[in-house]
Amino acid sequence: AETVAFGPMQKIIDAIIQGAPGEELAAIPLPESYKATVVLASEQTMFDGMDSGDKDPRQALHLQEIAMPELAPDEAVIAVMASSINFNTVWSSIFEPVSTFGFLKRLGKESYWGARHDQPFHAVGSDASGVVLRVGSAVRKWKVGDKVVVHCNYVDDQDASSHNDSMLGDNQRIWGFETNYGGLAELS
């Protein structure tokens, strides 16, 4: 099969397409950086004074190389095989109803792991499917090589109020909208 990936991602994509088992995927080094669709904090005011209908998301969305964040114990890294643009991405790109950088700054103040989200860029995207490449030390249900579809709800599994209904969680967020490192990227 022919692929369209280039650089460090090529080996990962080739292995996935060829059906490599998890142990083979785990042996492939992850790149230090990867391509992601981002909005920039420095452009938050670019649409000030404009009507919503006149704001063009294409002006604010950029394909940029970003550094691979450190993997938290309760996270996984996936090679994104498919993603989409939904209303969260459009809102992020026109900075409405508010700029998402406030969400990232607030998350950044919560913990060591949250601090990774407070960046001068926001890698957007609340939808993705892909293949697990790494899992954090506290991940129990998923393993390298699993094919996954990512749900946008970002919930603290240690918050008891979210166990029966994730919408009741005190810190429930939307992944790729209120968190960084979303699905419109090579890795997430």
Language-model region placement:
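Glycine-rich beta-strand-centered segment in the early N-terminal region that forms part
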Residues: 67-84, 97-159
